[in-house]
Regions:
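Nucleic acid-binding interface residues in structured DNA/RNA-binding domains
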Residues: 1-112
Length: 112
């Protein structure tokens, strides 16, 4: 179980992701000085409902597992770049455009 401090730190990063942009589990772990993207995934599974969970995606560019249909309206409303939209269950986030760059201030703001 992730520590309460780690949970708070992950959720704080997610709150700072701008609309229309995404970060991967690994990006969030890296921003926090952690090498544990799976721990970020665990936090999102347990507490992600409290934040914009659709802005946190796996490095594959797929929407959060089991939530593609729920996430698509959020992506469309926010203008998140998508690719290969075949249906509400079959698409990817265009990470080359949507992923928050490592030069974004969020990395400096949350770094330990």
């Amino acid at each position: 179980m992730p520590s309460p401090e780690f949970v708070d730190a992950v959720l704080d990063v997610v709150r700072r992701i701008p609309p229309g942009r995404v970060m991967t589990y690994g990006d969030i772990a890296w921003a926090l000085g952690s090498q544990a993207p799976r721990a970020v995934g665990r936090v999102m599974a347990l507490y992600g409902h409290a934040v914009a969970w659709w802005r946190v995606v796996p490095a594959s560019g797929l929407p959060p597992q089991g939530h593609a249909r729920l996430a698509l309206p959020h992506y469309e409303e926010e203008g998140t770049p998508l690719r290969h939209v075949e249906s509400a269950d079959d698409y990817r986030i265009a990470l080359s455009s949507a992923r928050l760059g490592y030069d974004h201030e969020i990395y400096a703001e949350v770094a330990p």
